[in-house]
Amino acid sequence: MMAALSLPVAGALRRAAPCATRRALGRIHATVSATAGSDRLTITAPDDWHLHVRDDAKIASVVPFTARVFRRALIMPNTVPPVRTTHEAGAYREKILAAVPEGVSFEPQMTLYLTDNTSPAEIEAAAASGFVRGCKLYPAGATTNSDAGVTDVNKCMPALEKMAELGLVLEVHGEVTHGSVDMFDRERVFLDEVLSKLVDKVPGLKIVMEHITTEDAVEFCKAQGDNVAATITPQHILLNRNAMLVGGIRPHLYCLPILKRESHRVAVTAAATGGDKKFFLGTDSAPHPKGAKESACGCAGVFSAHAALPFYAMAFEKEGKLENLEAFASHNGADFYGVPRNEGTVTLVREGWECPGEYEFGGDVVVPFMAGQEIPWRVVEA
């Protein structure tokens, strides 16, 4: 007997999303729901290899969404202050575990915030911890809470070489931050100016190109050895930049890297759905309070944890590739990180449900991806 998964919707306000957002996202559902296919899909329990859960009271609001569907998630370290040491990662991990619902099996996989001053000794401590999987490279100023990030990759070489030696993974936010580079070109320029050189300098380093958004990134990843892989978000395969900008600005679709033109969306979608082991699921679910998004200077980030797997199912179904969802969501990431594939399964059923307009978020509210829209897939549990 399969029972509908009970997601933590207490306090969620079922308000309609802004009309412009409803129109943009409604077009996605109209396309997907017209695609024929099976009404039930069972896959190995998945992992999310890129997740933000924030800190303090906000953790308890968002962790249950992920923990009830995914067995593991790679937790980003860009809190305030950032998670820079193994000791800090352990303390953060305990906060996250305290927010996991009773009876739910979920293991947060931790990362350290790489800085110009991260030492080889800290890398050794991280590798010995058993719960730190890698270090996150944020170019200083590239995204939320990245001001303490890396100013020059060359300053990190001792730490990166130690990571390669010990098998820790480097997770990369792949954008330059030069004021002279156009916002939509930051990823491409990063590949040319930074990542291509890094791959050559530390050839044994395992690298994840996080939340790739361009055809350039897809081709770069494919051209590298098995030590380079990439994660892909739901918004970057379901939407292009028109969804955010045409007919009015939709702040809840603003994220970094920013949504790109349609040709890039098509290329990234093909990479995600095509069965290539180099690409795997990483939502980059990044909640912000509603007021911080609906602002004259709004924060970057899309909150998608409430329905992450159904969003990917929508995209894979649209491409006629539902049979490849399991590898993308459950196999490729675990294999790359060198951890066992999960035991157990998760089942999705084709059963539409209305996404709430808001969810409670640590005493505030967060507006989720596809707020107020009908989502055609639902996760159920055995």
Identify what each model region corresponds to:
Residues 274-341:
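His/Asp/Glu-enriched, well-ordered alpha-helical/loop segment
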Residues 30-32, 37-38, 122-137, 145-281:
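Histidine/acidic residue-rich metal-binding segments in metalloenzymes
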Residues 1-20:
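N-terminal chloroplast transit peptides
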Residues 56-63, 117-127:
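Short, acidic/polar
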Residues 45-56, 170-176, 232, 283-285:
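Histidine-centered catalytic micro-motifs
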Residues 232-298, 346-382:
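Active-site neighborhoods of metal-dependent hydrolases
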Residues 48-49, 62-88, 103-115, 131-145, ...:
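Divalent metal-dependent hydrolysis catalytic cores, especially in the metallo-beta-lactamase
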